[in-house]
Amino acid sequence: MADQLTEEQIAEFKEAFSLFDKDGDGTITTKELGTVMRSLGQNPTEAELQDMINEVDADGNGTIDFPEFLTMMARKMKDTDSEEEILEAFKVFDKDGNGFISAAELRHIMTNLGEKLTDEEVDEMIREADIDGDGQINYEEFVKMMMSK
């Protein structure tokens, strides 16, 4: 399944993997997974984290290595995000709940994820998704952006 990914996708997933793999040892533990999920505003229990890891932990060693992570991402991409998941993600970004994602909100989330973006990079992301040109991302634009990746 992971063999259907492009080199660009694999490179992106490698970057994402290293955001999760805080100590850089090549594996993601429940602790590391929990840290990332909490930075996204989720609050998973230890049992939920363990379930998530068990789901993709092919060799049963209790952690996720990069090949296992790739398999998980390839699977996730196949069953494209449901409308509900996209709405949940939108709500995470839309901190003040006004129905729009501003540059400040986008910057805040990306920084929490460990992505240190310049103002230019954040503005570029907004520009790419901002179809009506109002300088922020509404739900419809967010859905289009999520579906096109």
Curated annotation (Swiss-Prot):
The record's annotation in CDD domains points to:
EFh (cd00051)
Record-annotated residues binding Ca(2+) 2? D57, D59, N61, T63, E68
Name positions with the PTM N-acetylalanine. A2
In terms of InterPro entries, this protein maps to:
CALM/Myosin/TropC-like, EF-hand-dom_pair, EF_Hand_1_Ca_BS, EF_hand_dom
| Recorded GO CC terms | myosin II complex
State whether keyword Calcium applies.
yes
On whether Nucleus is a keyword of this UniProt record, the answer is no
Which ranges carry the EF-hand domain? Answer: 8-43, 44-79, 81-116, 117-149
Keyword tags: Acetylation, Calcium, Metal-binding, Repeat
Which ranges does the record mark as transmembrane? none
Q: What does this protein do?
A: Calmodulin mediates the control of a large number of enzymes, ion channels and other proteins by Ca(2+). Among the enzymes to be stimulated by the calmodulin-Ca(2+) complex are a number of protein kinases and phosphatases.
Additional comment: This protein has four functional calcium-binding sites.
What is the official name of this protein in its record? Calmodulin
